[in-house]
Structures are given as structure tokens and as C-alpha cells.
Amino acid sequence: MTKSIFEYKDDQDWYLASFGSYNHLTCFGDDEAYEQYVDFFQGLTSTLDVSGFQLHVVKHSSDLRLVSFILDCLKEELGRDLVVTQHQGTLLVSEGDKLLYVHVPREGVSLDDFFGSDNKSDFGDVLLIATRNEGKTKEFRKLFGKLGIKVENLNDYPDLPEVAETGMTFEENARLKAETISKLTGKMVLSDDSGLQVDVLGGLPGVWSARFAGPEATDAENNAKLLHELAMVLDDSKRSAQFHTTLVVAAPGRDSLVVDADWKGYIGREPKGDNGFGYDPLFLVGNTGRTAAELSTEEKNEQSHRGQAVKKLMEVFPAWQNKQ
């Protein structure tokens, strides 16, 4: 069987190609030219899952002409319906309704040119944090920024309705908020629900932690209520408890991602420490004898339920996001 030889030749460009047992590139020119071609060649053939394509570059002036030649070869030999489109200095390779490869010139392109200055903010993955707390948002922005993801919060969407936390578990509440807001906005949404669980109280205050002493209760009132409930529990070992956090990430058309974590300790007999919030002044961390309110912010973030849950999330999030 005769092997097909493909050729394109004009005054500025001359390419030869065939199919063999492995991908291979040769060219006339210096090492710098070869490195430029081989990076492009390997990236394109790998992304398109092509094997056995052998290319020789005799003369080259146009990246568009080279890509068009390669795609013509693949169409004729393999029946691939690949199309190249020029866009603001880049070359976009698509097949059907899928964008498969983007070739950017070595000097790069302006983001304003590529996206359009009026629409640039609409591009790229966005994670909406279901909170109005700018401090919490800032921390998540640092973490997800490393993954190339823009982070927004509810302050960016003032017209969104409040989602009532009517669930009976932390996961139900976190899932309810994340999935509801995701449906309303069409965006990827992260929500959390956290609280204190005291074993001798059957897990209370649990999902009612913020309103244990009443709908508008202050931290001091909730702490006083908890001490009252434990007044007759004299054995310290019976005052075991844990802070719990559940994080849920929801996105349209996919199963939600759920992670959770606990921070174990005991309930003290009086508030201690000036840091933190909520039940921190009563929560004795493990067997340290120190309350969460006596820890520095760095110490707390390193070991707390929320810190542990966020670490778990960052470990599993990339795989979840890439899952089709």
C-alpha cells in the first residue's frame, strides 16, 4: 500500500507530511526555529490525540497556513472535521461545537483585544461564595486564585433573595443555599454551614448554634444558654464537643461536591480569651486547656474545623471541576 504524501507550497511556506508509526517533526533552520515548531507541534498533536503524524517544515511564514495544512491532512487521512479560526491574533482549533486548542503567538496577545474590553470580566471560571463577609471572601480568593478562578460574593448580587436555612443537618443547609443560588445565577457556588455539637446534649446546639438562645441571640447569650444547659454536668469528660463544618460546591448540571470536618474538644466552665467569636471562649481545644478564643488567628486557621474542611476542599476540587 502506497503511503500518502501531503504537500503545501507557495512562495513563503512549504510543508510536507505523511503518517507513520509515531509523531515526528523535522525542519530546516536553526535550533531556535526548531524549538518553536516542536513546542507547537507537540501541543497540537497531543491535544487533538493524534499519533503517527510526521511533518517536515521547509519554509514557514504563517502560523495560520501551517495549522490549516495540518488540519487538512488530518481531515483527509482520519476524517476529522477540524476547523481553524483566527481571533485577535490567536488561532482557535475546534471540532463540532468544542474548542480544542488555542495557539497564541510567542509575543502574546492583549486580554482586552482577545476578550473585548467591555466583556473581559465575563470570561473565565467564577466561584460565587454564599456570604457577604469580605474577610471570608478574601481568604477564599487567595486559595482559588491559585487555580485561576475568580471569586465573588453575595455583595456582588444585591438582588438575590436570602435563602432560609431550614435543613435539619449542616449538609442540608449548606446544600440548600449553594444549590438554590447556583440555580438562580447559573454560577458555581460555594456555601458552608457550621456549628457546635455537644455530645451530652445529643448534638445540640448543632444547626441552631447561631440562635440557640433565641432568633436574635448574641454570642454572649448563646454562651450563657450553653453553660446553663451543662450546669449539672460536673464530669469534664462528659462535656465533650466538636465544632463541625460542611462545605458544598454546586454548579448547574452536575452533582454537588461535599466535604466536612470536625474540631474536637470540650466545653469549659467559663469564657476565656479575647479572640474569635461565637462559642470560641468556651471551647477547650483537645486536651490543651486553651480555648479557641485564646488562639491566634494563624493557630486557629491551622487546626479549626473550617481550616480542615477548606484543606480537604482544595485537595478534591480540581478533579471535581474537571469532571464532565
From Swiss-Prot:
A molecular-function term among this protein's GO annotations: metal ion binding
Keyword Zinc: no
Cofactor binding note from Swiss-Prot or TrEMBL: Binds 1 Mg(2+) ion per subunit.
Gene Ontology terms: biological process: nucleotide metabolic process; purine nucleoside triphosphate catabolic process
Region feature (Unknown): 1-126
Positions with a binding annotation for substrate: T131, R132, N133, E134, G135, K136, S194, F277, G278, Y279, D280, K300, H305, R306
Required co-factors: Mg(2+)
Keywords: Hydrolase, Magnesium, Metal-binding, Nucleotide metabolism, Nucleotide-binding
Amino-acid positions noted as binding Mg(2+) in the UniProt annotation, renumbered to this chain: D193
Region (NTP pyrophosphatase): 127-324
Claim: Nucleotide-binding is one of the keywords in the record: yes
Gene Ontology CC entries for this record: cytosol
Reaction(s) catalysed by this chain's protein: XTP + H2O = XMP + diphosphate + H(+); dITP + H2O = dIMP + diphosphate + H(+); ITP + H2O = IMP + diphosphate + H(+)
Assigned EC number: 3.6.1.66
Pfam families: Ham1p_like
Active-site positions on this chain: D193 (proton acceptor)
Family: Belongs to the HAM1 NTPase family.
Binding partners and assembly: Homodimer.
Biological role stated in the UniProt entry: Pyrophosphatase that catalyzes the hydrolysis of nucleoside triphosphates to their monophosphate derivatives, with a high preference for the non-canonical purine nucleotides XTP (xanthosine triphosphate), dITP (deoxyinosine triphosphate) and ITP. Seems to function as a house-cleaning enzyme that removes non-canonical purine nucleotides from the nucleotide pool, thus preventing their incorporation into DNA/RNA and avoiding chromosomal lesions.
Protein name per its UniProtKB record: dITP/XTP pyrophosphatase
